[in-house]
UniProtKB/Swiss-Prot annotation:
Organism: Plasmodium falciparum (isolate 3D7)
Main location class: host cell
Location of the protein in the cell: Host cytoplasm; Vesicle; Membrane
Motif PEXEL motif, chain ranges: 86-90
Protein name as it appears in the record: EMP1 trafficking protein-7
Topological relation to the membrane, as annotated: Single-pass membrane protein
UniProt-listed GO biological process terms: symbiont intracellular protein transport in host; vesicle-mediated transport
Key words of the record: Host cytoplasm, Membrane, Signal, Transmembrane, Transmembrane helix, Transport
Assembly and interaction partners: May interact with MESA. May interact with J-dot compartment protein PF3D7_0801000.
Amino acid sequence: MAKDSQKNLNVSNNNNVQCTMGRSSQNINKSDSKGKIKRCTYAYKILLCTIFIWICQCFYNKSYYVYKKDGRRNKGKKILGIRINKSLAEMDHTKYHPEYYDEVQENYDPYYGVNQYSDECESYKSEDDDSEEEYYNSTPRVTVLEPQTENSEDEENYEKTIVDELNELPNDKKALILSYIRNGNDNNMQLLPYANNNKQNTQENISRNKEFFRHFVDFIKGYKLFDSPVLNALLPFIFIAFVYCTITMLVGNVRYIIALYILAKILKMHYDYKHKENNNNNNNNNNNNNNNNNNNNNNNNNNNNNNNNNNKKSKKN
């Protein structure tokens, strides 16, 4: 009987150990699953925030494609891929690459007369006005900077700058700036080319970090990573999801917000208490210094009075 009782005790102990091991393994599995769920929620929130930022970049992407035919541009399907209205990611790219300015200017030239806000997108010019286009292309536009002088005698001491657009260059309309320096008479006009060293100096002054950032931004804008009509179509749904996620985050983390508020209050009270103590100590020190100064002044006055009295007595004697 004693042996049977010992066997039963051993079996019960083994069962208890197995139960505790099973419970601990279940707890470990539950904690692992909770950790995975938290990681998934964090990844979901990060992904949602990135998508929202992406949509903000594409928010003004109300562009359409047009085709060009006989000098006219009409609204239509994507044939040549000429973009009329730029998206937010493509705006101000001339800031990083000024050589693209001519290409943008060609798309936005006023003599094409593209009305972006009309449905038919009709041209303001007629088809027979090719001569006017040739006139605009052939005649150089010159800007003369006149001197800001009042006296006619000082007119020979200024530098006149003329900006001339050379349209004869192939596929490139760059401005050649020439400086006319007046030396005495009109016959002694000296024609000097404008030294184009400003770009080199500015590139030397730019740090490497800014240069890398400029190239990186141009790479992103060149591949149009933030230009997606699908995201524009899904904008309302993703915006609602983003708002819902932010509200759930705030509601779920109310206790952390309350704890931070209480901690801030405690820190403020501690700082105010220390500040009051310092002010009281400073006031006490100032009062003590004032009292000492008053006592010293009184002692000096008494000494002066005593000296005066002694001098008077000595004179009488």
